[in-house]
Amino acid sequence: VQNVVPVEERLADATLAERRGQYAAEVRRLIDAAFSVMRATGDIDPQVRDIVKAAGLSNQAFYRHFASKDALLLAVLADGQRQLVDYLNARVGSTTDPEAQVRSWIEGVLAQARNPVAADATRPFAINGARLADRYPDDLAATRAELLTTLAPSVRALGGSDQDASFVCELALARMNDAIAHRRHPQPQEVQRLVAFCLAGVRHGT
């Protein structure tokens, strides 16, 4: 017996697929608009009206996807985190040598401060880090844990511990955030000094 999908179900599926694509595009526009507004103002608390205006959408579209502005900010954080994790994974995956992997990871983090475009995009989060941690402690802890997964295996391969990886991660991110907050672009010598310091710390702990 041939399994024929009723016409109403096929039409409903087609409509849902079309709306899914439309809604995904709207969410992308809202996230990009929020990034744009925050980069322009340096504030992590933009007005909804400014976001929807930049996105070319309506308040109705905004609240169709996000229950609140905080929900959008979490999506913005998650999106930026995903991009950074993908970037660091690609860097670490370009070599099989664990020391080179740790070096590349640290250089990749500091590159966010050395690149003017990346620094401008990250600056609102760098200067409001304490406020974000107070507002979204669980979400920020989860993003930090995800970042650690891109570094910890390489540190362990050098004989270090997960705590060592956490120290390296915290130090690299602190240096990045400090540079971004003060609109300072770390010089190559500073980056390499930080790399040498972190590698020495990992080896000292073994």
Predicted segment positions?
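N-terminal intrinsically disordered/low-complexity leader segments
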Residues: 1-25, 206
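A short, Lys/Arg-enriched amphipathic alpha-helix from helix-turn-helix/homeodomain DNA-binding modules
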Residues: 24-36, 87
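Amphipathic alpha-helical interaction segments
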Residues: 29, 50, 71, 100-108, ...
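Helix-turn-helix
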Residues: 29, 37-71, 75
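Alpha-helical DNA-contacting segments of helix-turn-helix folds
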Residues: 73-80, 143
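Hydrophobic alpha-helical connector segments
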Residues: 75, 89-115, 168
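Hydrophobic alpha-helical bundle segments that form small-molecule/ligand-binding pockets
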Residues: 93-95, 141-172, 179-183, 202-206
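Short secondary-structure transition hinges
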Residues: 110-152, 159, 180-181
